[in-house]
Regions:
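C-terminal-biased regions
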Residues: 2-45, 49-100
Length: 100
């Protein structure tokens, strides 16, 4: 017997509706990454950028990801890590370290 996978443990929670929900969450995450990347580039170029509402959108992404069955949520881990990295890069541009 091979290793147990989450799909094997939760087979009933991996239907077409769950797959559509996961794809929707994936699209939202991809959009957030693109938006933050664009904002970062504009900020680096000296432009003013309004990021109001971005925290709510990231919160929506996280909540929707948590609503997915475990196996599908786990598939989003690389996207979540990429989003986190982009949030960190954008935050660093917004609040650069002060020289001593």
């Amino acid at each position: 017997m091979g290793p147990m996978t989450l799909h094997a443990i939760f087979p009933a929670l991996d239907g077409p509706a769950d797959r559509r929900a996961a794809e929707s969450v994936r699209r939202l995450g991809t959009q957030l990454i693109a938006c933050l990347s664009t904002a970062r580039v504009l900020i680096e170029a000296g432009r003013d950028v309004d990021l109001c509402g971005m925290q709510d959108r990231v919160g929506e992404f996280c909540a929707r990801a948590l609503d997915l069955p475990p196996a599908l949520g786990l598939e989003l881990r690389p996207l979540l890590l990429t989003l986190r990295a982009e949030v960190d890069r954008t935050s660093a541009v917004l609040d650069p370290p002060t020289p001593d």
